[in-house]
Amino acid sequence: MNLLPLTFLFPLVGFLLLSFSRGRWSENLSALVGVGSVGLSALSAAWAIFSFHSSPPEGGAYSLVLWQWMAAGDFSTNFTLYLDGLSVTMLGVVTGVGFLIHLFASWYMRGETGYSRFFAYTNLFIASMLFLVLGDNLLFLYFGWEGVGLCSYLLIGFYYSNRNNGNAALKAFIVTRVGDVFMAFGLFILFQQFGTLNIQELLVLAPQKFPEGNLWLTLATLALLGGAVGKSAQLPLQTWLADAMAGPTPVSALIHAATMVTAGVYLIARCHGLFTLAPDILELVGIVGAVTLVLAGFAALVQTDIKRILAYSTMSQIGYMFLALGVGAWDAAIFHLMTHAFFKALLFLASGAVIVACHHEQNIFKMGGLWKKLPLAYASFVVGGAALAALPFLTAGFYSKDEILWEAFASGHRELLIAGLVGAFLTSIYTFRLIFVAFHGEPKTEAHAGHGISHWLPLSVLIVLSTFVGALITPPLAGVLPESVGHAGGEAKHSLELASGAIAIAGILLAALLFLGQRRFVSALAKSAPGRFFGTWWYHAWGFDWLYDKLFVKPYLLLCQLLGRDPIDRTLGVVPFSVRGGHNLLSLTENGRLRWYAASLVGGAAILLGALLLA
């Protein structure tokens, strides 16, 4: 376990080396340092995970105090690494999937300006995420939380010479900062009430000090939920995720599969004891997830950009995880987080291969017939798409998503179950719409398959992990998270499995019917009045950007314009202006004429006499 600090030190050192190189290194050397540091981190993580399983720590968790960061009076905080079943799972996902993404990126980014800068940012991204999942208290978790936010800004705006990319990065940074402010308020409340931010101490003290439904716990968990929805792109702070596709495609894979958007799910799962004492907020978590997954599913139906379709699918799948957390299916949420990392990384990397092969074309309707020219990318999309659609029995996504649906049913949340089933149907349609349009039909562009081990190896490994093989990896969460209500299952569970499987297959068949062939019905529907209305509404993600522009952006710009004129200074300037005006008026009386002075003297005396008589 002494190797545990190396998991984040290796990518941190890689970041420093690449930063100080200032782009002077060759691409091969930059790739060696950038990919190698994450590879060493993955090896260190593998050893830590092996040691955790072979020699289970007493109490189910291992703590390693590195140093005391701060001490003031009764307050002290240590930088301590905490490894239990939950952090072991996250450690494997972040380093394992992160390494595969880095390996693919070494091929994808060849010839790009800022090659070493890219790997410097991604190394820092991995280090920040590991800092987040290994910290034993919410303060250090928050440092990692802000670190991944900074890295997302740097990577989304990687092509900063393009104004739109810079705007997308700024949008992601600002929207997620809103959630971060809420999270900071949550930390303030928890520290004020408990005098500590150590997560394990909070989980012990909370039920001792407060009853279920306590106002302070409700406010604290609501604030933590605000932070979670910002990082994990859930309603109402979901608007940044689709625009984040402005960054390089491996960045999208890193954000969606291995790092940033899973942070909110991890936060709620890690603080499960606090949320169970605030049942109203826990129920709100499930509702937020259910609404998000349905709205994102409809938005994905009409997108034409290959990466934006996958972005909305991520929003929807994170919604399933929030739904699971909301019904108390803690294990199922983390299980789906893991399997989702496999097939979403596969889909994004495969989309990167398609984009490069098609000369950076991202509109799926300008592709077509790619299955012959790009067999590996096609296989990746078929397997990854099947896992995303939860094709029964063959894919990892089926087992994790089905567990969520069963827990929603077993806990009595039928409305959330219905939302999950609707989302499953939509997922099947938009996923295979992408596959049928891009890979079948008449070719519309020249495409050339990529070569090299850094291209095909990550895709091949992720293809295997996206099948039922990935579902065989069981997160060691026993004793870490509360046991779910519907843990056992039975005949009802098998019936639900068949129903959800049938829904997934029905969605695939409907997509084939609509998008294989001439697509006359789809064209006619798109040209109809309802089709134009809903198509435009869904294409713009239900108009949230428009709404926020009217509610927040325009008033803010108006306020900036008003303050730019410095109204306070102008208001305060009235005083000296009045004094100067009075002085100018009085100076007119000094005209050097004796008659005027005598008249003024008599007039002043008359005024004083009148005032005395009235008094």
UniProtKB/Swiss-Prot annotation:
The chain crosses the membrane at residues 1-21, 32-52, 63-83, 85-105, 138-160, 172-192, 210-230, 249-269, 281-301, 318-338, 339-359, 374-394, 417-437, 461-481, 496-516, 594-614. It comes from the Bacteria. GO terms for biological process: ATP synthesis coupled electron transport; electron transport coupled proton transport. Its EC number is 7.1.1.-. It is an enzyme of class 7 (translocase). One of its GO terms (molecular function) is NADH dehydrogenase (ubiquinone) activity. It is a multi-pass membrane protein. GO terms for cellular component: plasma membrane; respiratory chain complex I. InterPro entries: NADHpl_OxRdtase_5_subgr, ND/Mrp_TM, NU5C-like, Proton_antipo_N. Its main location: membrane. It is found in: Cell inner membrane. Keywords: Cell inner membrane, Cell membrane, Membrane, NAD, Quinone, Translocase, Transmembrane, Transmembrane helix, Ubiquinone. It catalyses: a quinone + NADH + 5 H(+)(in) = a quinol + NAD(+) + 4 H(+)(out). Belongs to the complex I subunit 5 family. Composed of 13 different subunits. Subunits NuoA, H, J, K, L, M, N constitute the membrane sector of the complex. PANTHER family: NADH-UBIQUINONE OXIDOREDUCTASE CHAIN 5. NDH-1 shuttles electrons from NADH, via FMN and iron-sulfur (Fe-S) centers, to quinones in the respiratory chain. The immediate electron acceptor for the enzyme in this species is believed to be ubiquinone. Couples the redox reaction to proton translocation (for every two electrons transferred, four hydrogen ions are translocated across the cytoplasmic membrane), and thus conserves the redox energy in a proton gradient. This is NADH-quinone oxidoreductase subunit L. It comes from Pseudomonas aeruginosa (strain ATCC 15692 / DSM 22644 / CIP 104116 / JCM 14847 / LMG 12228 / 1C / PRS 101 / PAO1).
